[in-house]
């Protein structure tokens, strides 16, 4: 048996029964209010369009995860799956196209994912874009699929696991970066420097330049 302390009776009562039901109701109402304020162009008040949009956002946010491991890479355009080198050990904070079928980060997809995430939570989007830029090597290349760890590899046929440094996706990750720049341009000049996005883009620019030069 474990040696941990038993849960506090006060804490368990705070998160059960009527108190839990009330808290869930409050959180749901807060989500609905924030959703309608963030996406005012969607027909609201329980319509089908709003339901579909809400499900889409929830699935996107629910698919965000942290992955850790080492990519298998090769500088050859083709070759057997058994011939590869290891990228450095790295973590990635990212959304995924599908939690059940594609539980890994895709560089191309993530640019489009972040157009939605940015509208919902700017700080979260900055964290994710920054996590991808941390995977940039000295030449400006980012492995386009992040197959990190045994769990991610189990969902990928062997012939597609190795990431080849001759291959790249279109730089869709620039799409949310452009949204960030547009956000800053929309602020009064005196407020731009204090916005967290300003510091983020300033720090990210050297990596974005190296990435651009790789293309």
What are these regions (language model features)?
Residues 1-215:
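Acidic, mature catalytic/reactive cores of soluble proteins
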